[in-house]
Design a protein with these regions (language model features):
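Nucleic-acid endo/exonuclease domains
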Residues: 1-113, 120-158
């Protein structure tokens, strides 16, 4: 399938996609604030520059886009053009995620990934369900987890 945009226009569009303070990150920030959790954002001192750091809970939350981090859900679809480029790009993102999560866990942090599909789209979690899953993870002995449109799951660094 041929892209409807020229390579220059497509490149411009992709550069315009924000990588911090996105709408889905703002939703998590509002939930954390409403529940009284203190947190820092985009902490450069930690591997992976986590989206949210909750120091009192020794917990980290990453908010991942399903496309950019290859979540196998209904929101992910590999582009039909420049497939080799996108496959390499997304593979490197996934490998980097695993490396950072492993480093954080070795340093004693609990790590949670909240996937975009949990926050937006036709199957997103309702606010109350999302809040319950976040609190469940924070209170559980689960050292790494992920929340997607289906709920809370264990996450394993391979």
């Amino acid at each position: 399938m041929v892209d409807v945009h020229s390579q220059a226009i497509r490149s411009k569009n992709m550069r315009a996609i924000r990588n911090q303070d996105t709408a889905i990150e703002q939703r998590i920030a509002l939930i954390l604030k409403d529940r009284g959790f203190s947190y820092r954002v985009q902490d450069k001192a930690l591997p992976g520059r986590p989206d949210f750091v909750l120091p009192q809970e020794r917990a980290i939350i990453f908010v991942h886009g399903c496309f950019w981090h290859r979540h196998h859900c209904y929101l992910f679809k590999m582009p039909a053009t420049r497939t080799e480029f996108w496959n390499g790009k997304i593979n490197s993102n996934v490998e980097r995620d695993r490396r950072y999560i492993g480093q954080l866990q070795q340093s004693g942090w609990k790590v949670l990934i909240v996937w975009e599909c949990a926050l937006r789209g036709k199957l997103r979690l309702e606010d109350e369900a999302l809040i319950e899953r976040l609190e469940e993870w924070l209170l559980a002995a689960m050292h790494s987890g992920e929340i997607d449109h289906q709920g809370l799951h264990h996450y394993r660094v391979e």
